[in-house]
Amino acid sequence: MKEGIHPMYNEVTVKCACGNSFLTRSTRKEIFTEICSACHPFFTGKQKLVDTAGRVERFKKRYGQA
């Protein structure tokens, strides 16, 4: 690699709006995010399934998944 043309790749702290923070590496000095794995509904288990017109129940009934 050529000397002096690549950006500095440092260890930085990623800060989330929920207050969680973790370390990673980046060319930026600091990173702010609105949602992370600590507060995202998919990772916290608080994800809600939106059922439009009973399609999920119809699928479960049709294919025998209870």
Swiss-Prot record:
Q: Name one GO biological process term.
A: translation
Physiological role: Binds the 23S rRNA.
Q: Which UniProt keywords apply?
A: Metal-binding, Ribonucleoprotein, Ribosomal protein, RNA-binding, rRNA-binding, Zinc
Q: Where are the transmembrane segments?
A: none
User: One of this protein's Pfam families, by short name?
Assistant: Ribosomal_L31
Q: Which InterPro entries match?
A: Ribosomal_bL28/bL31-like_sf, Ribosomal_bL31, Ribosomal_bL31_A, Ribosomal_bL31_sf
The cofactors it requires, by name, are:
Zn(2+)
Q: Name one GO cellular component term.
A: ribosome
Subunit and interaction comment: Part of the 50S ribosomal subunit.
Q: Which family is annotated?
A: Belongs to the bacterial ribosomal protein bL31 family. Type A subfamily.
Q: Name the Gene Ontology molecular function terms of this record.
A: metal ion binding; rRNA binding; structural constituent of ribosome
The gene is rpmE
Task: Summarize where Zn(2+) binds, as residue positions.
Answer: 16, 18, 36, 39
Return the protein name: Large ribosomal subunit protein bL31
Cofactor remark: Binds 1 zinc ion per subunit.
